Swiss-Prot record:
This is Uncharacterized 14.9 kDa protein. Pfam families: AcMNPV_Ac75. It comes from the Viruses.
Amino acid sequence: MAGGLRGFVAELKKSTEFVAKVIFVKARLSDWLNSQVYPDERFSAKWRGVLKMFVDGQLDEESVYCLVNTIDPSKLLTVGQINYLARAFRNNRKMMSITQKFVDGYRLSDDDISELSNYLVAQVEEVYQL
């Protein structure tokens, strides 16, 4: 009985940590979009252009790596991990649809940001297992 409960508690803790990460990513992403991207039409157009090149497969692995390191200079992800994340993202229809929506000039909905945040947290956790 105690072993089953321990497993339950461990699973609950893991789930709670995942949800907390998703909430954190969603809050940061929403804040960034609403405070920096959407209000600044010039920056927004540049960012949409970069994402359009990503969606269209025009960015090589080195360009994606440089882009990630510009956004997050901590360099916690290796080249292989970034390549894995980029391929996984490109192969996910829902994520590409959300990205295309943004590229086309639409504001992302709260549901879009939630799905994007959930996906990103899951993928980053997976890539750290590699």
